[in-house]
From Swiss-Prot:
Key words of the record: Cytoplasm, Flavoprotein, FMN, Isomerase, Isoprene biosynthesis, Magnesium, Metal-binding, NADP
Role noted for this protein: Involved in the biosynthesis of isoprenoids. Catalyzes the 1,3-allylic rearrangement of the homoallylic substrate isopentenyl (IPP) to its allylic isomer, dimethylallyl diphosphate (DMAPP).
Residue sites binding Mg(2+) per the record: 161
Self-association state and partner proteins as the record states: Homooctamer. Dimer of tetramers.
Protein name according to UniProt: Isopentenyl-diphosphate delta-isomerase
Amino acid sequence: MTGDTSARKLEHLKMIVSSKVESRESTLLEYVRIVHNPTPEVNLGDVSLEIDFCGGRLRAPLVITGMTGGHPDVEWINRELASVAEELGIAIGVGSQRAAIEDPSLARTFRAAREAAPNAFLIANLGAPQLSLGYSVREVRMAVEMIDADAIAIHLNPGQEAYQPEGDPFYRGVVGKIAEAAEAAGVPVIVKETGNGLSREAVAQLRALGVRCFDVAGLGGTNWIKIEVLRGRKAGSPLEAGPLQDFWGNPTAAALMEARTAAPDAYIIASGGVRNGLDAARAIALGADAAGVALPAIRSLLSGGRQATLKLLKAIEYQLKTAVYMVGETRVRGLWRAPIVVWGRLAEEAEARGIDPRWYTNTLRLEALVYKDVK
């Protein structure tokens, strides 16, 4: 099992880089328009992107979300990405640490991130199915201690497990196990999806049990069902997802509105198809605390090295900064105060789910500011 887990991590990475692994469905972020202010009454140099985040602080509201680790050949990737996060003062997550729990010799592939980023906000990672199958607070703490993490992500991936040839589609009792982890982990627990999006009901349930940090990881970006179907074809698996691999799930923008409605005081990462600073600005204006990217960071690193990744993330950061400036705010959470228009499919989906877009944009976003450091 240990060798299988490690080998699968390397296979995932190779497929992410070489195959079309993104959903054909949209994030729906294109249905968010931030109203431009032609008389902003602030200078660009006045703008600060610094935020408080899940018990820590970031110089910019960006997260390189976890995707890799657990094989000797990918250690350098975690090291390089972490060094970029350290330089920019942003957060970074590692991929699932299950392989290193099974084989402690692989811990170095994850520990490399902390070695390269002694001051960065570092997020550990374990899968929800492993909690359901027997992992306890002990393994959660092991993952945290392995990399001296500031938080731990518990990732939800029922779709991926259902189509993974060697998957573990076991979720019975998982909510209670997540609640136990949130109470005893010693660091904040971030519950994250993996490309199919969180829902209003799930976030409300978990928030009531003590979880305050979420990553919506919505539909519209990297799709792990599609990745597992592609892997399965090579291995002769009969499992085919059909259109489900492109269109099953909650698009990122819709998932974000649902999560913020369910938990106004939560810290929420919007990931899933975020590819540039406008995507990040739209997501934050819609109520996210931070935007998450993974696939673009890894692909840029593998194609152009560390400097390419640094250039990409600096560009996203600058585009986000100019968006804050062009609405007349000096703090990034000022985007929550900026007038926005939610229209088209996103507005229709919100209404169908019982969320009035006007109430959301004009009332809920402002009320949520009460819970955050906006000085």
